[in-house]
Amino acid sequence: MDYQYFEEESDYIDLDEEEEDDDVVTAGSLDHRFGQPNGEEDYYFGGDDVEEELVVDGHGVLELAGRLLESLQSCVQPSVLQVMQYVAPMLLLCLLCRLLCLLYSQRRRLTSLAPLHLFHFACGLIILQITVGYRLLLLLLLAAVGYLLLQLLRLGRRGAQVLAVLTVGSQFLYELLIWRRRSDWPQLRGIQMVVNMKLISLGFDLTASGQLQARIPGPFAYLGYIYSPATCALGPWVSFGCYMDCLVPRNSWLVSLRRLLPNVVICVLAVTVSNCVAPALSDFFGDSSHFLVMYWDALSVRSSHYFVGMMAQALLVASDQRLDGATKESDMLGPLISQPWRIEWPRSISSLVRSWNIPMHEWLKRYIYAPCKPTASTSRGRILVVVLSTYLVSSLLHGMDLRIYLVLISLAFLAEGESLLRRQLASLLNACITANLCPGKERCRYSHCPSKRRLNSLSYWLARLTNLAFTALAIFHLAYLGVVLLGDDLEVGEDGDSFLWHWQQAGYLSHYIGLGTFVLYLFIS
């Protein structure tokens, strides 16, 4: 998923430039489902002998408990075991790379950085060999092509733009013409997407003032950056400068281990919810409420994303690799890739999608949105073009997936409409009900702000209820859009239902609501 890009007058007093630009949409993530046994529906059974007095809304409490217990026995244990088998080697290799770099850097004279790059490259290759097997050869071939494309930077800023177009376009055409029907490409696509983001960022960073500012990295530095063990398998994107700053570890081992444990625990919980709990609840509520079915199915997708994000955070912590941007590290978790608490209970659509993949948000804002950044006098049509262009680049980075295209365009439509409407309402009512989080009573520009009012104030409760209504609406949109991403393909299933079946059953309500927000905004503006 992506980011809400919108620029106008500041909602709050003294907002710095970073906060003004922070309305963008992330796309995406790598959605994997580990350890889910085949024939999962066979594990959820029962309830035929439930007593009638234990029935709530037509469903037995004992039936639900029985299904969850069966899921615990038949699904959770194999899921956790498979995840640990997948995670442990990656963590150990990241720790090994960190140890080797630390030992080498303690020499009296650090005459060359080449060994540090080689440590990263070697450990990254082993991780990819464990992850993708023989297909690693294809990734190395694509990396070699990428290094050749870097030579275009000698043309200056135009060379960086050509590099970006060729990098994104080549992956799109490669999948379209050759790999569309290959079952192994979807896994490689996520890895190659991160590589492409690194190439593009490196090109623009080296030609920031219109000409080549520094020497193009040598082969060792390039391979160490592209295949660093902290980011090569699951991401996220980090800039070349950030990679160089973290070549020599600085944090203590105790701090890293303290942060590593909660990331692994949350990772296990996320895969348990994704593979076992959410499918069981979706099956149980299947006959009662279509919204609940959509919500639990979408929760399975989101939890899969949380698993990947938390696993990637654990690898960053193990390698002592920091992230770009102004986002502060969490004392408990370290560098943050995703913020599930802001996704599951969002203030707005734009806030939840900004929290979906924070490094990708930073990449899109820095290299796609900022160069086309609209000014205060820019027309509304120009702003819309910039927003759609950013979403288009984000979609192309993910390769050919019609579901992602539909979700991203829908998010652009919904988030922009909500942001415009709430900004206009906040201005008319002088109330803190915009899509952005309130910065506190000292900086909020609105008189009717909950942080400035007491509990017995009417304006306090009106602002709270308005924000709560938009939160509930964002949760509905989250379920409506997320359920489309469930599954691996676009083909019609055995029961004849297409991947848009849930949208059809909901009457495309979310899209009509989005259209209504635009109409209401135009009416009151």
Curated annotation (Swiss-Prot):
Subcellular location: Endoplasmic reticulum membrane
Gene Ontology terms describing biological process: lipid modification; peptide hormone processing; protein localization; protein maturation; regulation of Wnt signaling pathway; Wnt protein secretion; Wnt signaling pathway
EC number: 2.3.1.250
Ranges annotated as spanning the membrane: 83-103, 125-145, 159-179, 220-240, 260-280, 301-318, 395-415, 467-487, 505-525
Matching Pfam families: MBOAT
GO CC terms, sorted: endoplasmic reticulum; endoplasmic reticulum membrane; membrane
Active site: 398
Entry's Gene Ontology molecular function annotations: acyltransferase activity, transferring groups other than amino-acyl groups; palmitoleoyltransferase activity; Wnt-protein binding
Keyword Cell membrane: no
PANTHER family in the cross-refs: PORCUPINE, PROTEIN-SERINE O-PALMITOLEOYLTRANSFERASE PORCUPINE
Described function: Protein-serine O-palmitoleoyltransferase that acts as a key regulator of the Wnt signaling pathway by mediating the attachment of palmitoleate, a 16-carbon monounsaturated fatty acid (C16:1(9Z)), to Wnt proteins. Serine palmitoleoylation of Wnt proteins is required for efficient binding to frizzled receptors. Also facilitates the glycosylation of Wnt family members, including wg and Wnt5. The cotranslational disulfide bond formation of wg competes with the N-glycosylation. Porc stimulates the post-translational N-glycosylation by anchoring wg at the ER membrane, probably through acylation.
Subunit structure: Interacts with wg and Wnt5.
Protein name listed in UniProt: Protein-serine O-palmitoleoyltransferase porcupine
Name of encoding gene: por
